[in-house]
Amino acid sequence: MYPLKFKPILKSTLWGGERIIPFKQLDCQQEQVGESWEISDVPGDESVVAEGADAGKNLTQLMEEYKGKLVGEENYKRFQGKFPLLIKFIDAKQDLSIQVHPDDELAMKRHQSMGKTEMWYIIDNTGGQAHLYSGLKKQITPQKYADMIENNTICDALDKYDVQPGDVFFLPAGRIHSIGAGCFLAEIQQTSNITYRIYDFNRRDKNGNLRELHTELSKDAIDYTVSDDYRTHYEPRKDEPVELVSCPYFTTSVYNLTETMNMDYSELDSFVIYICMKGACTVTDNEGNRISVKAGESVLFPATTQNLEVVPEGEVSFLETYV
């Protein structure tokens, strides 16, 4: 197997902006692109390989063909043949809805699906004008929650953050959240497209209709635990990995490289994904496969990868994630 790039799946949304297409240097015309699905095995939105011997095959077909060689033997068994992560870039020109995602148990019971634990890495904040919501800032009961939804005051219970490039937020299933206007970010999440929309600022869609809310479904999906700080704190460093998140669903680190680095994955029984956010680099694997990676691109390295040599062109910043 060889390092895989996929064709992006662009999603126009009510709240989408204009940054994704130039960021990814795409030659296409599409308005209000809110999301680019970089690597996806969501039914109906399976990523298609862009180049090489497997060009034209989608991720589901790759899973059927390569199995543990692609994702790792234990991952293949654990996730029953499904690719476990969904990778996105998200550009919010307007606020997204206040929402929550169910955990594995509730999602399987209701939707025969995995839950959705996710994380965000802020790439740009529109000159300091971006914010988001993450978690409850005060204790509320399910009944109080229902009352606040009814009175359109749920935002008063949420922790609001002004964000800067490099900020990180970990969002376990059950945590209420919303991406705010001005945020441009990378999102790593479980392979799930289940979202319970809690509040949508009384917006109407292109047909003039209020968007559907999931008030009852969300009530018992919410984790009502309150924390003092929902931001992930870390110390940025150059030319070494900085771990951001480690949870049962993914481990993610950030790299800011100015010099060549050799990555040893020989003991890792998992695929590895690089999500490039700034600059460019050339990556060569242990079989001699060489691939160029630039800002806006995501690359999937199969579980058969033993080691990688990463040579930055000047400086490069990317996220590394695996299961």
How would you label these PLM feature ranges?
Residues 1-140, 200-228, 252:
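Transition-metal
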Residues 82, 90-95, 104, 125-128, ...:
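Ligand-binding loop in jelly-roll beta-barrel domains
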Residues 87-88, 96, 118-121, 160-161, ...:
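His/acidic/aromatic-lined binding-pocket segments of jelly-roll/cupin-type domains
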Residues 139-151, 269-282:
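Short, basic/aromatic beta-hairpin or loop at an interaction surface
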Residues 148-196:
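Loop-centered beta-sheet repeat module
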Residues 158-170, 285-304:
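Short acidic-glycine-tyrosine-enriched beta hairpin
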Residues 196-268:
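C-terminal amphipathic alpha-helical segment
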Residues 262-263, 279-284, 298:
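Short beta-strand segments in beta-sandwich/barrel cores
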